[in-house]
């Protein structure tokens, strides 16, 4: 794997290779000394041109646990704020010694443009590009679901996909790169994905995606989902009114206490105890109630922890793809 740009690029075998490698990395993360020499002498640049907490810190931790040198770059205080182009920025970073560029960018398609441009020889990892994709978030979500499934079935994790799992993704699909990446990846791994959102928050062309669409969250909850993934409303990307009010959105599309109680009282298609997922940050009281956010059924912090292992796997595979992992 030379780059990681989109989950749509990943075959089932590719996705399982990342998840299986991440399991080996997770074993390292349980040690007292959480280090591997896999990327010693390599330089990873975190080029974040949009704000981030979880993803940036997770990639930094992942690279350092693989013994890489890490350079963190943000637009604020750099020449980007003076109008420097992406081409000049990345060529400067490669001249400094970047072997991999982990990039978050406000423009959809920016990561693929960089990888295909010939501007640099560095590996490119998409850490989120506009409303397009966020592949490592989808991979860590799949990793989390696979672990839950293995715990429920007692089966070996290695080589296991998500066949038969039912996952509902709820909320602002229109502006969500997480939703797009999850639809492609989860369907590739055999899961049944349903999008639940008002028509105003669904993108044009969604009917062609490998998923089902419903305009009723309550109907989606009645279909015995194994996981319900709540998405925040991305008000910063909205130029107009996409729903009447915050209160109306919560009543219709929020995981309220009543809906959460219904979810936890039932069983999923494969999991006896369905889970709530959230990529963060959570807007408590809007898309998710405080009780649901704080429940042990909420895997948000589990997802964050798993993200380090998954990103270790991704960095290893794009930079050392011809070598075996040795935990």
Swiss-Prot record:
Name any GO cellular component annotation: cytosol
Is the Transferase keyword given for this protein?
Answer: yes
Highest taxon of the lineage: Bacteria
Residues annotated as binding L-aspartate:
82, 177, 232
Q: Where does carbamoyl phosphate bind?
A: 54-55, 104, 134, 137, 280-281
The protein's matches in InterPro entries, at most eight in alphabetical order, are given as: Asp/Orn_carbamoyltranf_P-bd, Asp/Orn_carbamoylTrfase, Asp/Orn_carbamoylTrfase_sf, Asp_carbamoyltransf, Asp_carbamoyltransf_Asp/Orn-bd
Q: What is its EC number?
A: 2.1.3.2
Under the GO molecular function aspect, what terms does this record hold?
amino acid binding; aspartate carbamoyltransferase activity
Q: Which UniProt keywords apply?
A: Pyrimidine biosynthesis, Transferase
Q: PROSITE patterns under this entry?
A: CARBAMOYLTRANSFERASE
Membrane-traversing stretches: none
GO BP field: 'de novo' pyrimidine nucleobase biosynthetic process; 'de novo' UMP biosynthetic process; amino acid metabolic process
Task: Give, as in the UniProt entry, the pathway in which the protein acts.
Answer: Pyrimidine metabolism; UMP biosynthesis via de novo pathway; (S)-dihydroorotate from bicarbonate: step 2/3
**A Pfam family it matches:** OTCace
| Catalysed transformations (reactions) | carbamoyl phosphate + L-aspartate = N-carbamoyl-L-aspartate + phosphate + H(+)
**Which family is this protein grouped under?**
Belongs to the aspartate/ornithine carbamoyltransferase superfamily. ATCase family.
Oligomer and partners: Heterododecamer (2C3:3R2) of six catalytic PyrB chains organized as two trimers (C3), and six regulatory PyrI chains organized as three dimers (R2).
The record's function comment reads: Catalyzes the condensation of carbamoyl phosphate and aspartate to form carbamoyl aspartate and inorganic phosphate, the committed step in the de novo pyrimidine nucleotide biosynthesis pathway.
Query: What protein is this chain from?
Result: Aspartate carbamoyltransferase catalytic subunit
Q: Which gene encodes it?
A: pyrB
